[in-house]
């Protein structure tokens, strides 16, 4: 879901060239949902193997990761851990929305309105624990580092960006800004739109507010921990309240658990237990997982596996040379 203030903050269109030579932390769950929604057949249904299991996420992880490496961008995938208890309401809302979409999809199929069915099919994107674990397994076969966050993946990715271990957080949501990520890149794992760069300092300077104020605006509008926000208050009114200095008083009165929500953003659970090193891929392991177990096309996978091997071999070789001549 994420906070919805994208229309009110400065964004800059960038190219893949602008990210050349940089490491980025990918909000894993956000990207996997994108893949489930966008990587589909013409009738709107997701890719499946012969057992009927959805494989769209594996397709996205494999080919998008290689595409980034081809552009000299090193992806570090970050996955969610245990969500804060306050997120349960948001998860319930999401489940209900998917259930409604599934009913409408089935109704459209009965009427043989396949265009309408495809529209609703994209909203029925269930990401199972098995899919997530398989994506992690695929990344390990590919030699790509991933991080298991103790709680929210975006919080962990933001922490890594603040430390300077990665240059930016990659996510379609804006929540990473609330965790203090210095830079957020959108549209990097999509295909239709140009990447956008959002810089936290530019946002705060443009609005003439602090990060604390930005978090308050988000809480007014609604976050994953208080979906819907404060009734009748959108960005403009929230901004006015923040600028007038009365925002906190209003929020404490209107938002249950305000202090706890604020603490989630300002003091998130994070870990330093991660590696950023690429490893040579397990070629046979990748082919076994994608082709033998999930019915991907052998020729296409083999071509990309060879490409992946060469990309990582060259990167690790260059890193060794750089270290030698330091």
From Swiss-Prot:
Ligand binding (Mg(2+) 1): 27, 80, 152, 154
SMART domains the UniProt entry points to: HhH2, XPGI, XPGN
UniProt region (I-domain), positions on chain: 116-245
Cofactor section: Mg(2+)
Disulfide bridge positions per record: none
Annotated spans, Interaction with PCNA: 317-325
Protein's GO biological process: DNA repair; DNA replication, removal of RNA primer
Cofactor note text: Binds 2 magnesium ions per subunit. They probably participate in the reaction catalyzed by the enzyme. May bind an additional third magnesium ion after substrate binding.
pH curve summary: Optimum pH is 6-7.
Enzyme class: hydrolase
Keywords (A to Z) from UniProt: DNA damage, DNA repair, DNA replication, Endonuclease, Exonuclease, Hydrolase, Magnesium, Metal-binding, Nuclease
Record region (N-domain): 1-98
Domain of life where this protein originates: Archaea
EC number assigned by the record: 3.1.-.-
A GO term, aspect molecular function: magnesium ion binding
Similarity comment text for this entry: Belongs to the XPG/RAD2 endonuclease family. FEN1 subfamily.
HAMAP family assigned to the protein according to its UniProt record, in alphabetical order: Fen
Function: Structure-specific nuclease with 5'-flap endonuclease and 5'-3' exonuclease activities involved in DNA replication and repair. During DNA replication, cleaves the 5'-overhanging flap structure that is generated by displacement synthesis when DNA polymerase encounters the 5'-end of a downstream Okazaki fragment. Binds the unpaired 3'-DNA end and kinks the DNA to facilitate 5' cleavage specificity. Cleaves one nucleotide into the double-stranded DNA from the junction in flap DNA, leaving a nick for ligation. Also involved in the base excision repair (BER) pathway.
Oligomeric and partner information: Interacts with PCNA. PCNA stimulates the nuclease activity without altering cleavage specificity.
Descriptive protein name: Flap endonuclease 1
Gene: fen
